[in-house]
A protein has these predicted regions:
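Surface-exposed short loop/turn segments
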Residues: 29, 71-73, 83-128, 132, ...
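Second-shell loop/turn segments in exported
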Residues: 48-55, 144-154
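Sec-dependent bacterial lipoprotein signal peptides
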Residues: 1-25
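A structural "domain/chain start" motif
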Residues: 22-63, 67, 74, 82, ...
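Compositionally biased, intrinsically disordered linkers/stalks adjacent to structured regions
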Residues: 150-173
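Short loop/edge segments at beta-strand edges and connector loops
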Residues: 79
Length: 173
């Protein structure tokens, strides 16, 4: 048996194995979503219905959710008639003391935000849900939730809430 006659079947076997391996990779991606049976999504404007209002957070949240889905999937965004629809409202924006000092002042405060989400999957109605998502950010009691403190708080809170919404709706975690 010559070297060439030995290598030719080996190359064919290797190419076939590689083809099967790569074809299986299309079912899963690094975001954990697997194959999504949809082509389009829409994120309707989330109203701020919290008792305490921080102007502009509803727009920031809506854009964050839209950007996360757009960046982590191959879905196309649309304004109407989408396969997947996200809508809801911000239901809570609350600042509360977490720990106190000896002179009864807040040593640490917590900003909590809750968002009620209605998710509709027009192709698979059994995936639809309405659910509340919330997260918090702790900050120094000497600070107010404004400026850089508020920016950092919203960044962390919205990152967590939007990822939780993404996982619940598309990754099924």
């Amino acid at each position: 048996m010559t070297y060439k006659s030995f290598i030719k079947p080996f190359k064919l076997l290797f190419a076939t194995a590689l083809l099967f391996t790569l074809s299986g990779c299309s079912v899963y991606n690094f975001t954990g979503t697997g194959k999504i049976d949809a082509e389009t999504f829409q994120v309707n404007y989330f109203q701020n219905n919290a008792e305490l209002i921080e102007p502009g957070i509803e727009r920031t949240f809506t854009l964050r959710l839209r950007d996360l889905i757009q960046n982590q999937t191959n879905l196309s965004i649309t304004d109407t008639g989408a396969d997947l629809i996200y809508e809801g409202e911000i239901t809570q924006y609350r600042v509360s003391p977490m720990t106190a000092t000896a002179d009864q002042r807040a040593a640490q405060n917590r900003l909590s935000i809750s968002v009620n989400v209605r998710f509709t999957d027009r192709k698979h109605e059994d995936n639809d849900f309405e659910k509340s998502f919330s997260f918090f950010y702790d900050f120094n009691g000497d600070s107010l939730p404004s400026g850089s403190v508020l920016t950092a708080a919203l960044e962390e809170i919205f990152e967590r809430i939007t990822q939780d919404i993404f996982n619940a709706s598309l990754a099924k975690w």
